[in-house]
Amino acid sequence: MATPVESGTVPCSLEPFDVYLFGRGEHWDIYRVLGAHAHAQDGETGYRFAVWAPNAHAVSLVGPFNDWRSGDFPLFPVGTSGIWAGFVAGMEYGRLYKFAVQGADGTVRLKTDPYALYCEMRPGTASFTWSLDSYAWNDAAWMQRRREAGPPLQQPVSIYELHAGSWMRRHGEGHPFVNWDELAGTLIPYVRDAGFTHIELMPVAEHPLDQSWGYQTGAYYAPTSRFGTPDDLRRFVDLCHQQGIGVILDWVPAHFPKDDWSLGRFDGTALYEHLDPRLGEHPDWGTYVFNYGRHEVRNFLFANALYWFKEFHVDGLRIDAVASMLYLDYSRKEGEWLPNVHGGNENLEAIDFLRELNRVVHEQYPGVMMIAEESTSWPGVSRPLYTGGLGFTFKWNMGWMHDTLNYMRQDPVFRAYQHSSLTFSMLYAFSENFVLPLSHDEVVHGKGALLSKMPGDMWQQQANLRLMYAYMWAHPGKKLLFMGGEIGQWNEWSESREPDWCLREFPAHEGIRNLVRDLNGIYAQEPAMHRHDHDWSGFRWLDFSDYGCSVISFARFAEDSPPVMWVFNFTPVVRRWYRVPCPRAGEWQEVLNTDSGYYGGSNVGNGGGAVACTDNWHGGHFMELTLPPLAAVALKPV
């Protein structure tokens, strides 16, 4: 048992302006006011504890220091703010605690601090007294470049999505997770070598259940203890920045779990959520939905988003399940939802919350990314606020993902009849600032790995995967690939095991990784491949109509930079003397061929290049190519 803290609690004051801003929902550093913080009072040092529980009958501090007995260390109301606070002299750094909240219903619940900075390892749910002020950053050059560059709409963004708990694991008995330092030593060189510009971490805030992958967050301000301390995560981000790699976090403001120790019914009432389950509960996930109309709840979430940018220097947040926030009838049958004041299904409070969130984030941290996982056709998700948009930097292109995977699943014999699945995305490619995602959602729950979705024998499956990756990297939009996809993983992902890294011993699988590296290289090095990812000036169809041969071709453009021309053959038939329109006459170099033996292909190609001639009849230019089977060819002018 820990040494008792003899003094108990005494009242302490909070700055009136802090309380005022919190009541308005506009205190961006509220996590430095509420929660547990080192404090000096009346000549003594210790910790100040503060928690918002406006409907509670009583709140006290419990922990090993008082054998978890409620009532021994009472907190005191701070005026009429709904905040309870108290000072404990002699309380030290690194001590476990919880709040014992006697709710409006008379029940005493032991609650995790909503503003906890660090928590114990699951299944424990207590918080530690902690500090935010001990880490010295070494990424000033990166942060300055990010500020000066602004949002990366015209920059290459290629994201490697990963689950920190399964990218690398300890084997044998005991704790299965590696810490952030161990992960950094292996992951950062790997990602850098593969040419990705950013890492996206699935949620790293504390969560009780491994199988939730972090999407049911229990403590929003506490990096999970599975991988080390908050400073360990800071060091991981710092090291990424020093190696030129950005870090994006998945963030979950759409819902939270019903666990009794967490935010739900925090003071015996529906405090963070709506009371009516038609508004306050999510039927798919069995979770609570935040009350976005309550100032203090909005403040909790606004400040949390800013917290990751300010205290952890992250470069972006990917907001999960945005569609579930926008629609009151999301995944609900008639009678299971309530319309808004205008009779519609739009969640007006959530819409206002998202718009204000993006305004504040971009105002406070220019150059960072706010990315929406939004699966419907809601207009203007990534359009500016002044045009009526939601203000996100990017939106996941779920339509492109579904159509592409649907097309690639087809036997090549039948692809001619699905040709529109391949070309339809260009009708809306510039309606939003899109990220093309091949994410974790596509390789779990019986969906199979990307490679296993491909038709044909083993060679054809691998060729199809290489072809799909080339199509993805050539298509307008930023890129996202989930871990394991770069080596042609056969098994679908599980949070309890690593990718099958042994596959890298096989040339065909290492060839897929080589291709991803080279695709990232072309994407980053050729301005035509990324500068106009979000407008028509960077794209031109050469031929989209040859559905009979399942061949398409297009070119990418940027001012003061040579174009890059792409030709795709979605059948296993080698097509010789295939005539393709091209942007200009002269010599063209073959800069990438997914059928190269280096990638695991059959080495059918064009001898390193081709010559484009002028078509005197039509006044354009063309070249005749040999199209490899199930392959893509990229060319640029010499």
Swiss-Prot record:
The keyword Transferase applies. It is an enzyme of class 2 (transferase). The active site is at residues 320, 373. Signal peptide: none annotated. Keywords: Carbohydrate metabolism, Glycogen biosynthesis, Glycogen metabolism, Glycosyltransferase, Transferase. GO terms for cellular component: cytosol. Its EC number is 2.4.1.18. CDD domains: AmyAc_Glg_BE, E_set_GBE_prok_N. It catalyses: Transfers a segment of a (1->4)-alpha-D-glucan chain to a primary hydroxy group in a similar glucan chain. One of its GO terms (biological process) is glycogen biosynthetic process. Pathway: Glycan biosynthesis; glycogen biosynthesis. It comes from the Bacteria. One of its GO terms (molecular function) is hydrolase activity, hydrolyzing O-glycosyl compounds. InterPro entries: A-amylase/branching_C, Branching_enzy, GlgB, GlgB_N_E_set_prok, Glyco_hydro_13_cat_dom, Glyco_hydro_13_N, Glyco_hydro_b, Glycoside_hydrolase_SF. Pfam families: Alpha-amylase, Alpha-amylase_C, CBM_48. Catalyzes the formation of the alpha-1,6-glucosidic linkages in glycogen by scission of a 1,4-alpha-linked oligosaccharide from growing alpha-1,4-glucan chains and the subsequent attachment of the oligosaccharide to the alpha-1,6 position. Belongs to the glycosyl hydrolase 13 family. GlgB subfamily. Monomer. PANTHER family: 1,4-ALPHA-GLUCAN-BRANCHING ENZYME. This is 1,4-alpha-glucan branching enzyme GlgB.
